[in-house]
């Protein structure tokens, strides 16, 4: 999974940017290039040797022309200035590198040493490689990116339909107070899969730049509420009460680091289970955060107060408007919104 800090750097060379135009022109002319992005060139006097000082306005055309010389080009990080051209970059030779070509070995060492962006264009393979800190990202062809994104969006649509169906089924069980841990874990796992595909797709969309505008809108529409729903599910079903920040951290752990399984998700939620078959036998009760937020439009900050008083969704559903009004932050309007939203859901489920 591509880390967010690297995604921000990939944006610098996405189609539609001036730097990408320069890189594409360099490849079309069958040139190579080594480009170093810095905040203050004077800080790197021991690394930047030879060449000549320009300190001129940045443009794609200038970068292309300067790439005709053998040396590297030094640009400002905000891509407004060209500082140096035709320089020799001398990073610490003891820094390990897995690259073979001279240009790419220099780029990798320089990025590791300085923590800055270094871009290498291979003359022989016509490939753009971006190095940043200890990361390396090889830029993909637009046709390949479009194909990958289209396939991912199609997969996401199916996963989102399944996730919505599981949430709908869970809602029925919640209102009937017969949710099992298996129901919760199944829903969470589908949501994690959905979010993982989203995170894997995001770098491709970023790399597409202007070409990825439609895909970016589709991705946002498909997943804009999934993160919030997952956090609310974790808050609803953790064996011990957790706040929103803790639930978000648990979710990120599932999405970015853990290989989620029914057992691992159950244990993180606080349930001591040894076998998957146990999940069907463990009855759990929702606290009500998700219903309060999504159906009654009650802010989380007020939802805490409701859950603190009534403990579970089942108890909230049995409370009268007058009972609900005793909660701090709940007036007549919000009390009716909670009561009516629960009644409406029960009525809708009964009539289906």
From Swiss-Prot:
SUPFAM superfamilies: RuvA domain 2-like, YojJ-like
Domain of life per record: Bacteria
InterPro entries xrefs: DisA (IPR050338), DisA_sf (IPR038331), DNA_integrity_DisA_N_sf (IPR036888), DNA_integrity_scan_DisA_link (IPR018906), DNA_integrity_scan_DisA_N (IPR003390), DNA_integrity_scanning_protein (IPR023763), HhH_motif (IPR000445), RuvA_2-like (IPR010994)
GO annotation, biological process: DNA repair
Catalytic reaction equation(s): 2 ATP = 3',3'-c-di-AMP + 2 diphosphate
Keywords: ATP-binding, DNA damage, DNA repair, DNA-binding, Magnesium, Nucleotide-binding, Nucleotidyltransferase, Transferase
Residues reported in the UniProt entry to bind ATP: 71, 89, 102-106
Cofactor needs: Mg(2+)
Gene3D superfamilies documented for this protein: 5' to 3' exonuclease, C-terminal subdomain (1.10.150.20), DNA integrity scanning linker region (1.20.1260.110), DNA integrity scanning protein, DisA, N-terminal domain (3.40.1700.10)
Pfam families per the UniProt record, alphabetical: DAC, DisA-linker, HHH
EC code: 2.7.7.85
First-tier enzyme category under EC: transferase
Residue intervals of the DAC domain: 3-143
Molecular function terms, GO-annotated: adenylate cyclase activity; ATP binding; catalytic activity, acting on DNA; diadenylate cyclase activity; DNA binding; hydrolase activity
Family assignment from sequence similarity: Belongs to the DisA family.
Subunit relationships: Homooctamer.
Cited function: Participates in a DNA-damage check-point. DisA forms globular foci that rapidly scan along the chromosomes searching for lesions. Also has diadenylate cyclase activity, catalyzing the condensation of 2 ATP molecules into cyclic di-AMP (c-di-AMP). c-di-AMP likely acts as a signaling molecule that may couple DNA integrity with a cellular process.
Name of this chain's protein: DNA integrity scanning protein DisA
Organism: Thermotoga neapolitana (strain ATCC 49049 / DSM 4359 / NBRC 107923 / NS-E)
Gene: disA
């Amino acid at each position: 999974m591509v880390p967010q800090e690297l995604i921000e750097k990939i944006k610098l060379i996405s189609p539609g940017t001036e730097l990408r135009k320069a890189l594409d022109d360099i490849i079309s002319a069958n040139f190579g290039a080594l480009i170093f992005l810095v905040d203050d060139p004077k800080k790197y006097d021991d690394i930047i040797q030879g060449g000549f000082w320009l300190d001129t306005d940045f443009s794609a055309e200038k970068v292309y022309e300067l790439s005709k010389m053998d040396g590297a080009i030094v640009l400002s990080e905000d891509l407004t200035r060209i500082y140096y051209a035709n320089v020799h970059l001398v990073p610490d030779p003891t820094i390990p590198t897995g690259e073979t070509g001279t240009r790419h070995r220099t780029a990798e060492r320089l990025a590791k040493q300085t923590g800055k962006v270094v871009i290498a264009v291979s003359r022989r393979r016509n490939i753009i490689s971006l190095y940043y800190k200890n990361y390396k990202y090889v830029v993909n062809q637009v046709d390949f990116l479009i194909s990958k994104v289209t396939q991912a969006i199609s997969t996401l649509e199916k996963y989102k339909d399944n996730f919505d169906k599981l949430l709908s089924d869970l809602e029925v069980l919640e209102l009937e107070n017969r949710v099992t841990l298996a129901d919760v874990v199944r829903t969470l796992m589908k949501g994690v899969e959905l979010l993982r595909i989203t995170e894997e797709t995001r770098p491709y969309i970023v790399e597409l730049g202007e070409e990825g505008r439609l895909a970016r809108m589709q991705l946002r529409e498909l997943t804009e509420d999934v993160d919030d729903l997952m956090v609310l599910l974790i808050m609803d079903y953790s064996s011990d009460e957790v706040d929103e920040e803790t639930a978000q951290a648990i979710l990120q752990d599932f999405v970015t680091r853990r290989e989620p399984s029914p057992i691992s998700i159950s244990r993180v939620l606080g349930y001591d289970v040894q076998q998957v078959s146990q999940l069907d036998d463990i009855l759990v009760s929702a606290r009500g955060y998700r219903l309060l937020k999504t159906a009654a439009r009650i802010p989380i900050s007020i939802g805490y107060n409701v859950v603190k008083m009534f403990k579970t969704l089942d108890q909230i559903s049995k409370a009268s408007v007058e009972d609900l009004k005793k909660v701090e932050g709940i007036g007549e309007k919000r009390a009716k919104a909670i009561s009516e939203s629960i009644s409406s859901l029960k009525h809708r489920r009964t009539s289906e």
